[in-house]
A protein has these predicted regions:
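PLP-dependent amino-acid enzyme catalytic core
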Residues: 1-207
């Protein structure tokens, strides 16, 4: 199958039954292969949603400069989406972000700015807001942007419901910005209020 643009390949990822799970449970456990998205993660969905919806509302236009604080997959996805849609983008991250992620972002044409490890993501977000106040770019603000969970309410959630035939009892998701778990759970709970939602994060996580 051929697609005219890369954004049309985002989403509709496959569900795969996990066969080798610990314990003796007979429950069916499915994993959704979000790594099959073109930039390699579930973050492709909100990245496109935030840019496309802001553009549709007339808040930004191709050629504008976008700014975002991110040290992970959202940055890679935003760099891809910005390149495809004709935006410049500056990504701000702590200096201890992985070299592999930095390389992926720059490969898509993003400009990177580092803050110190001690400043962390809070410092990166502060700098992004300062740049916006100085007219140096438009902050997408993945942490507070409703277009983040909207991507999962309109896409990921309906896909899961469709591909399970509605036969889902639990949804389990990691939590970062919480866009995935908020959007998917909102949709699934509308279909069946009895579905259980389980959020996971590292014991020492800051989310």
């Amino acid at each position: 199958m051929q697609y005219p643009t890369i954004d049309q390949t985002v989403g509709n990822t496959r569900l795969v039954r996990l066969q080798r799970m610990p314990g003796n449970s007979s429950n069916t456990i499915l994993g959704k292969l979000e790594g099959d998205n073109p930039a390699g993660s579930v973050k492709d969905r909100p990245a496109l949603s935030m840019i496309q919806n802001a553009q549709a509302r007339g808040e930004i236009k191709p050629g504008d400069h976008l700014v975002e604080a991110t040290s992970g997959n959202t940055g890679i996805a935003l760099a891809m989406a910005a390149a495809m849609m004709g935006y410049q983008i500056t990504l701000i991250m702590p200096a201890n972000a992985t070299a592999e992620r930095k390389a992926a972002m720059t490969a898509y044409g993003a400009t990177l700015i580092e803050v110190t490890k001690e400043q962390g993501m809070e410092g990166a977000r502060d700098l992004a807001m300062q740049m916006q106040a100085q007219g140096k770019g438009r902050v997408l603000d993945q942490f507070n942007n409703p277009d983040n969970p909207l991507a999962h309410y309109q896409g990921t959630g309906p896909e899961i419901w469709r591909d399970t035939g509605g036969a889902i009892t639990h949804f389990v998701s990691s939590m970062g910005t919480t866009g995935t778990i908020m959007g998917v759970s909102a949709y699934l709970k509308q279909q069946n209020p009895d579905i259980q939602i389980i959020g996971l994060q590292p014991e020492d996580g800051a989310s």
